[in-house]
């Protein structure tokens, strides 16, 4: 409504898990309230990402970002679904998520899940242009701040949108 996602549903048939959120009413997993993780920085975190298979021109800076983050976090996960990765952020299963070149239908539901679970979602510069750029960072505010400061050093100008 008016350009805002009001209701989100992400279903994982492999685990029979239904993630839901309604703006202003919180996020749930199979009826249980979700609150995202509480990591203070990147040390010991599990991060999720996807790879820009249609945006090969960004491969080098993106791999540089992954490499730099790899030295600061505990591990990476990749489900193959931005919506599910964001649902996992909302559930606290992973601490943060970042990816480039997404379409709104890839992340709109997951974005609301993260926000309703107490997290934030930004573009790669910490702004709110992710629906236009398709570049997204999500997690609790401290994790997002740490991700952004680490990523900025490696991003090409084309990704700073």
Regions found by a protein language model. Give the residues of each.
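Acidic donor-binding loop at a coil-to-helix junction in glycosyltransferase catalytic cores
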Residues: 105
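Alpha-to-beta junction loops
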Residues: 91-96, 119-120
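Acidic beta-strand-loop-alpha-helix segment within the catalytic core
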Residues: 1-86, 133-161
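Hydrophobic residues within well-ordered alpha-helices
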Residues: 87-90, 111-116
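AMP-binding (ANL) adenylation modules
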Residues: 125-130
């Amino acid at each position: 409504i008016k350009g805002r996602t009001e209701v989100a549903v992400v279903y994982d048939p492999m685990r029979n898990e239904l993630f839901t959120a309604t703006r202003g009413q919180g996020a749930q997993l199979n009826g249980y309230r979700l609150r995202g993780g509480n990591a203070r920085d990147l040390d010991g975190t599990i991060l999720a990402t996807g790879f820009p298979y249609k945006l090969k021109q960004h491969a080098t800076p993106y791999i540089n970002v992954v490499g730099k983050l790899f030295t600061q976090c505990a591990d990476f996960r990749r489900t193959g679904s931005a919506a599910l990765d964001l649902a996992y952020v909302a559930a606290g299963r992973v601490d943060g998520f970042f990816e480039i070149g997404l379409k709104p239908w890839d992340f709109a539901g997951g974005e609301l899940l993260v926000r309703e679970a107490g997290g934030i979602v930004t573009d790669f510069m910490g702004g709110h242009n992710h629906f236009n750029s398709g570049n997204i960072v999500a997690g609790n505010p401290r994790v997002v701040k740490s991700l952004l400061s680490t990523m900025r050093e490696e991003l090409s100008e084309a990704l700073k949108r």
